Design a protein with these regions (language model features):
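Glycine-rich nucleotide/cofactor/substrate-binding loop typically near the N-terminus or early
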Residues: 1-43
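Internal alpha/beta core interface subdomains
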Residues: 32-133
Length: 133
């Protein structure tokens, strides 16, 4: 549904900087848990368009919560690993296996770069669909 993912405890847990006293105080005050791994599988917008679906079905496949989670995780790459698509699962698994279930800043930057690429591609596909209307 449309009204479930966009919650301040979720986004607070992703966006809170672990080295920022103010952020940490707010997390404690509002009982917000830290989230250090975000894995997203966006609605299949392009496949829905390609299937010849109705405009209503296409509109419903515009992912809002997922894309917001991707952007939040990528923004806080210093503290969060963002896995923006199923295509990234093998890469994450390889890193975790090699490094003992840990990531470093370079790993997180790489995932953030991939995340903004996924976000950009997704938004471009939506833009292109609207431009053809």
């Amino acid at each position: 549904g449309r009204v479930k993912t966009l919650h301040p405890k979720i986004f607070g847990g992703i966006l809170a900087r672990r080295d920022n006293t103010g952020d940490q105080e707010q997390m404690k005050e509002y009982d917000i848990p830290a989230i250090d791994l975000v894995i997203v599988d966006l609605y299949p917008f392009e496949q829905t368009v390609a299937s010849g679906a109705s405009e209503q079905d296409i509109i419903e496949k515009i992912d809002i919560g997922g894309i917001s989670l991707i952007r939040a995780g990528a923004k806080n790459f210093k503290d969060v690993v963002i896995v923006p698509s199923k295509a990234e699962y093998p890469l994450l698994l390889d890193i975790l296996n090699k490094k003992g279930a840990k990531t470093d800043i370079e790993d997180r930057k790489m995932f953030a770069e991939h995340a903004f690429g996924v976000s950009s591609h997704y938004d471009t596909a939506i833009h292109n669909w609207f431009a053809k209307k």
